Amino acid sequence: VIDAARAHGFKSVSVDLIYGLPKQNVISFNRTLEQILALSPDRLSIYNYAHLPSLFKPQRRIMDAQLPSGETKLQILQLAIRRLTEAGYVYIGMDHFAKPSDELTTAQRQGRLHRNFQGYSTYAECDLLAFGVSAIGKVGPTYAQNVKTLDEYYDILDSGRLPVLRGIELTPDDLLRRAIIQALMCHFELSIESIEIAHLIDFRKYFAAELADLREMEKGGLLTIDDQWISVLPAGRMLVRAIAMVFDRSLPSDRERTRYSKVI
């Protein structure tokens, strides 16, 4: 498939890998990496397996004892980062790697990198149209998800309506937090002054609770905070999702206890 894509002029070929699968370990994942590196894709994404048996019935056949521990998953992620960087890939952040010549790497270097719910992208603030069962779309400050069963999807389309199950319109606070999360995930730094000017807030007053959480991460060597910038350190890049989650208002109140276990 990769050879065919290149033969037909595809500019970039991406491969997704999942870690945390049943019976997976560091040795087996290393074998997978060796096979993938031999194919030399332009981009790789390393995703954490989401075990949600309450939502996905086939996952109920998987026993919890078959799943690798959090420690093993962290070792797998560290292995992936080391092997891919040694092979010449640039660590874009979180879960993405790309060759130095790839446009994703160029966008990161030029400060044009963007992230949506599908991953990193070179296209900032584009509307996304959702086609298919359970697909999620974004238009302006709104998000919408389609219905989750094929029969219902076709029935609604046949009746001349859009098969939307639910949606949300972002509030000014949502837009503010989205801008902060985007900056941290894409550029690994946040200009406090820029946020204050763009959203007309006093950052330290508005995010007093969040800054207290970040101070704990600062003590752990994940980031630094000064008068004008929040900067993610190299050790924090692997956990930038957890850093960004501090600003996610939709998380439960006990987020501090569960943040790292959810990320790894």
Locations of regions flagged by a protein language model:
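C-terminal scaffold of the Radical SAM
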Residues: 1-204, 258, 262-264
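Residues at alpha-helix caps and immediate loop-helix transition turns in enzyme cores, especially N-
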Residues: 28-29, 206-209, 243
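Short amphipathic alpha-helical segments
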Residues: 175, 179, 190, 209-212, ...
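Short amphipathic alpha-helical interaction segments
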Residues: 202-218
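A short, conserved structural fragment
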Residues: 218-228
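Minor-groove-contacting beta-hairpin "wing" of winged helix-turn-helix DNA-binding domains
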Residues: 229-233
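Short, amphipathic alpha-helical interaction segments positioned at domain boundaries
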Residues: 235-264
